[in-house]
From Swiss-Prot:
Transmembrane segments: none annotated. It is a peripheral membrane protein. One of its GO terms (cellular component) is extracellular region. The keyword Zinc-finger does not apply. It comes from the Bacteria. It is found in: Secreted, Cell wall; Cell outer membrane. Belongs to the PMP outer membrane protein family. This is Probable outer membrane protein pmp7. Keywords: Cell outer membrane, Cell wall, Membrane, Secreted, Signal, Transmembrane, Transmembrane beta strand. The gene is pmp7. Residues 1-23 form the signal peptide. The keyword Transmembrane applies. Pfam families: Chlam_PMP, ChlamPMP_M. It comes from Chlamydia pneumoniae.
């Protein structure tokens, strides 16, 4: 259809091109040609009559024409008049503006061509504006701004603004034979224009075609009014809107005239088509029509979505009488084709008004009209939140193809065609007309899904299902054959919609017609939450399906009963069990029920939280960082008595594992301590700390922890020779090795004992938008024993000391049992973490050049000799379902790099800082601190 439209319009272009070679060219610029009649000057009309050439006006700068005929006598004709040939405006990327022009009752207030088949063209403007040319107040008998007996085109412009224009004739802005809008790079805005009483086309009236195509910008028609038909566009030939970036029809209206129809578009001429194809974004919203087609009234309508396509809140009808087609109306003997090719098509909140009553309606198919195809490409959907109506008595014999591809097409139509009542209020759902769709044609579902949701009824003349397709029904929905049979071989029922009373229904309405059901009945959990229903903790029975025929001789065939089986989800979370299908016979009907037997429970990832367990690893990270802080503080210049304060921060990240979620721990706070040196030069430190922690897993849980702790540190240094001599005892003969040991080499011992208490507050964010909270307490204890052997090295500006060391560190952390105080809450048993690690490493120390500070670098290998990973029994409060939850597991070996600095500001103050990084095969830990100590 697109090719025929383009040929029709452009058939005149070769003639125009040949004429343009010899056309008279007139240049326009601001200084010589711009006009503003507010100063009382007289406007001279630009008028030419050369039939052989036509005229081209070429802009040299921005030009504007304002208030011509507005303050006195109206102009005798429009501003630009071409009586002989084509009239062309070449913008050369300049702006052209017309505002408040009054040409009395002359057509073409701005510009016109009057010779047969001559063209009016506007090309390559940075901005083309036509405002109030004329306005209703200025000229109640005024006519359209642009008039062409031939073709009118707006091509290659950056911005177009046509607003507040008025016409007492057809076409609120434009009246032409063929209209073309193409290549708009930024936007084309047509707003608040109107065609007066009984006239058509609030913006454009075309006795030929309307073509809007290939615009990378936004094309919008908003709040335009035709007091006849076609609130924005009216065409007596084809109307084609194709391959644009975004097209918007909002708030347009066709009103007042008795048969006003097509709130946005009207094209009802015999054999003519409205084609909407390949648009990246297309929307019809809030348009209204007095009678038919709140958005579109057409004989033939073909929509192929190139992106999201929306029909929303359009209305047909009024308090004076019933309308037809809230969004789209197809006239008698017409056709409709819908294809969601590269985007979804959605009909929502469109309505038909009849007096004081309104009902939902997407599409109205009048009597002998038909739907040729409704199809959605794989991955796309067509959503009918409003029903389809098909009034009349003469059912079409032409087949409606659902998801059938064209011959030799590479597009696979395996998407979903959805009829749903989910956007209706409870009051609206109670009205049958709001949930009942009828298409009086035989239908074939070729591929993909036909989906019935939330209480809707969908009726075809008859319905046949091809292999590889699926019909998915909610409980409480009905699929009906109005005049013939139902033959289905791929039925699925949405478990999430079953409440123990409602069921999916298949029925025939005509007497003695048959229902055939074969293959499998798939049980689908579309919301993924059905198996969390606590009714499943015990044996349950759900009505599933009712098959009903009319008349005494209708038959219900279930195929070979052995092959009519349930197809359950292969894997799912929640209650585990088995379904069994059973049938009960009644008069002219069969009722199928499914019986549930429970076998177990598998928690979903959002229920299977391991945050309480992993909070113990957070305590593990924090208590080790306190020990590292005290070590860093103590390695500086010793004072006899000192008070110190330091900030501290930790970041820990554990990758996800196949069976356990990843984990992140962030904490920060401060530590305050006091250190004293004994007469024997031993150091004794006591510290208090407060930390604020944030934990998060990779699913839906977050935890906030408030931590308080205390630490005791003892450091003692003894000569290596003295220790060896003591260990040898009072032997009569000292071993030779004793004589090889220097009497000045020290051996350092340190011991640290730390305790942390944490108040945890966890939030779990479920996919149904509920939030469940839980609180508990953790306690952690650490004992750390170590020894080091420092060696002094006299290498100026390189190294001062090398100190190998070894430690043994024991950490115990305990999580209190608790439960979440919600109906869907969980109970967590207590758990504990025990870890014994042996760090082995070496510290390199050097003096700064200023001799007021030191730097040190520590390299450390860590071996976890023993570990008990946290785990606990978890259960649902509302059920006896329980499972074992496991905390994360760190690799047993790691490597750490730690850099520290000490700077003595004066004899009474020192600043110290540290950055540490520990890596294991699947985790990373960063620690930093910065503080000061004061001598007193």
């Amino acid at each position: 259809m697109k090719s025929s439209v383009s040929w029709l319009f452009f058939s005149s272009i070769p003639l125009f091109s040949s004429l343009s070679i010899v056309a008279a060219e007139v240049t326009l610029d601001s200084s010589n040609n711009s006009y503003d009649g507010s100063n009382g000057t007289t406007f001279t009309v630009f008028s030419t009559t050369d039939a052989a050439a036509g005229t081209t006006y070429s802009l040299l700068s921005d030009v504007s024409f304002q208030n011509a005929g507005a303050l006195g006598i109206p102009l005798a004709s429009g501003c630009f008049l071409e009586a002989g040939g084509d009239l062309t405006f070449q913008g050369n990327q300049h702006a052209l503006k017309f505002a408040f022009i009054n040409a009395g009752s002359s057509a073409g207030t701005v510009a016109s061509t009057s010779a047969a088949d001559k063209n009016l063209l506007f090309n390559d403007f940075s901005r083309l504006s036509i405002i109030s040319c004329p306005s209703l107040l200025l000229s109640p008998t005024g006519q359209c701004a642009l008039k062409s007996v031939g073709n009118l085109s707006l091509t290659g412009n950056s911005q177009i603004i046509f607003t507040q224009n008025f016409s007492s004739d057809n076409g609120g802005v434009i009246n032409t034979k063929n209209f073309l809008l193409s290549g708009t790079s930024q936007f084309a805005s047509f707003s608040r224009n109107q065609a007066f009483t009984g006239k058509q086309g609030g913006v454009v009236y075309a006795t030929g075609t309307i073509t809007i195509e290939n615009s990378p910008g936004i094309v919008s028609f908003s709040q335009n009014l035709a007091k006849g038909s076609g609130g924005a566009l009216y065409s007596t030939d084809n109307c084609s809107i194709t391959d644009n970036f975004q097209v918007i029809f909002d708030g347009n209206s066709a009103w007042e005239a008795a048969q006003a129809q097509g709130g946005a578009i009207c094209c009802t001429t015999t054999d003519k088509t409205v084609t909407l194809t390949g648009n990246k974004n297309l929307s019809f919203t809030n348009n209204t029509a007095l009678t038919y087609g709140g958005a579109i009234s057409g004989l033939k309508v073909s929509i192929s979505a190139g992106g999201p396509t929306l029909f929303q809140s359009n209305i047909s009808g009024s308090s004076a009488g019933q309308g037809g087609g809230g969004a789209i109306n197809i006239a008698s003997a017409g056709e409709l084709a819908l294809s969601a090719t590269s985007g979804d098509i959605t009909f929502n909140n469109n309505q038909v008004t009849n007096g004081s009553t309104s009902t939902r309606n997407a599409i109205n198919i009048i009597d002998t009209a038909k739907v040729t195809s409704i199809r959605a490409a794989t991955g796309q959907s067509i959503y009918f939140y409003d029903p389809i109506t098909n009034p009349g008595t003469a059912a079409s014999t032409d087949t409606l193809n659902l998801n059938l591809a064209d011959a030799n097409s590479e597009i696979e139509y395996g998407g979903a065609i959805v009829f749903s009542g989910e956007k209706l209020s409870p009051t609206e759902k109670a009205i049958a007309a709001n949930v009942t769709s009828t298409i009086r044609q035989p239908a074939v579902l070729a591929r993909g899904d036909l989906v019935l949701r939330d209480g809707v009824t969908v009726t075809f003349k008859d319905l046949t299902q091809s292999p590889g397709s699926r019909i998915l029904m909610d409980g409480g929905t009905t699929l009906s054959a109005k005049e013939a049979n139902l033959s289905l071989n791929g039925l699925a029922v949405n478990l999430s919609s079953l409440d123990g009373t409602n069921k999916a229904a298949l029925k025939t309405e005509a007497a003695d017609k048959n229902i055939s059901l074969s293959g499998t009945i798939a049980l689908i959990d579309t919301e993924g939450s059905f198996y969390e229903n606590h009714n499943l903790k015990s044996a349950s029975t759900y009505p599933l399906l009712e098959l009903t025929t009319a008349g005494a001789n209708g038959t219900i065939t279930l195929g070979a009963l052995s092959t009519l089986t349930l197809q359950e989800p292969e894997t799912h979370y929640g209650y585990q069990g088995n379904w069994q299908l059973s049938w009960a016979n009644a008069t002219s009907s069969k009722i199928g029920s499914i019986n549930w037997t429970r076998t177990g429970y598998i928690p979903s990832p959002e229920r299977k939280s391991n945050l309480p367990l992993n909070s113990l690893w957070g305590n593990f990270i924090d208590i080790r960082s306190i020990n590292q802080l005290i070590e860093t503080k103590s390695s500086g210049e010793p004072f006899e008595r000192e008070l110190w304060l330091s900030g501290i921060a930790n970041f820990f990240y554990r990758d996800s594992m196949p069976t356990r979620h990843g984990f992140r721990h962030i904490s920060g706070g401060y530590a305050l301590g006091i250190t004293a040196t004994t007469p024997a030069e031993d150091q004794l430190t006591f510290a208090f700390c407060q930390l604020f922690a944030r934990d998060r897993n990779h699913i839906t849980g977050k935890n906030h922890g408030d931590t308080y702790g205390a630490s005791l540190y003892f450091h003692h240094t003894e000569g290596l020779f003295d220790i060896a001599n003591f260990l040898w005892g009072k032997a009569t003969r000292a071993p030779w090795v004793l004589s090889e040991i220097s009497q000045i080499i020290p051996l350092s011992f340190d011991a640290k004992f730390s305790y942390l208490h944490t108040d945890n507050h966890m939030k779990t964010y479920y996919t149904d938008n509920s939030i469940i909270k839980g609180s508990w307490r953790n306690d952690a204890f650490c004992a750390d024993l170590g020894a080091s052997l420092p060696f002094v090295i006299s290498v100026p500006y390189l190294l001062k000391e090398v100190e190998p060391f070894v430690k043994v560190q024991y950490i115990y952390a305990h999580q209190q049992d608790f439960y979440e105080r919600y109906a869907e809450g969980r109970a967590f048993n207590k758990s504990e973490l025990i870890n014994v690690e042996i760090p082995i490493g070496v510290t390199f120390e050097r003096d700064s050049k200023s001799e007021k500070g030191t730097y040190d670098l520590t390299l450390m290998y860590i071996l976890d000799a023993y570990r008990r990973n946290p785990k606990c029994q978890t259960s649902l409060i509302a059920s006896d379902a329980n499972w074992m939850a496991y905390g994360t597991n760190l690799a047993r070996q790691g490597f750490s790099v730690r850099a520290a600095n000490h700077f003595q500001v004066n004899p009474h103050m020192e600043i110290f800082g540290q950055f540490a990084f520990e890596v294991r095969s699947s985790s990373r830990n960063y620690n930093t601190n910065l503080g000061s100590k004061f001598c007193f």
